[in-house]
């Protein structure tokens, strides 16, 4: 929340203060997963700017731990991570009742036509290619949620 105040006073008169409050709407909790810390932070910043409270993970197993510890309203994940990849993460999350219908967006360097199909089959709602356009990411999440 932020606040500002307009102050006015006439000579010899009372001072009037009119506070203005701006509440930032929290759109929910988002989990960002990428093995590259710079990309993780960039994606987190985009989602924070869009009104989300963001948690980050740098591997699929860490993301699963986070998802078991609290419920997220949206998951944005890289695909090409060492060990357990993003497709495997999506499949495990979609098997959990609380994650069956939340928006899940794949963000990846894999940009061939069949990569999009693999992402959908794994459980992602959208497949966005890197470099990520912040507007495209937030629009994709909005489309899924509405």
Where are these regions (language model features)?
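Charged docking surfaces used in two-component/phosphorelay signaling
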Residues: 41-49
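Short hydrophobic/Thr-rich beta-strand motif most characteristic of the beta2 strand and flanking loop
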Residues: 51-58, 66, 128
């Amino acid at each position: 929340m932020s606040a500002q105040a307009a102050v006015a006073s006439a000579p010899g008169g009372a001072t009037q203060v009119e506070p203005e409050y701006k509440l930032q709407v929290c759109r929910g909790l988002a989990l960002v997963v990428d093995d590259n810390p710079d990309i993780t932070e960039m994606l987190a910043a985009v989602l924070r700017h869009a009104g989300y409270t963001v948690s980050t993970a740098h591997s699929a197993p860490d993301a699963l731990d986070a998802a078991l510890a609290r419920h997220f309203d949206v998951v944005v994940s890289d695909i090409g991570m060492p060990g357990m990849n993003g497709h495997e993460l999506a499949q495990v999350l979609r098997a959990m009742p609380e994650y069956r219908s939340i928006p899940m967006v794949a963000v990846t360097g894999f940009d061939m036509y069949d990569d999009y199909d693999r992402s959908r089959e794994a459980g992602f709602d959208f497949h966005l290619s890197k470099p990520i356009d912040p507007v495209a990411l937030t629009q994709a999440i909005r489309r899924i949620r509405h």
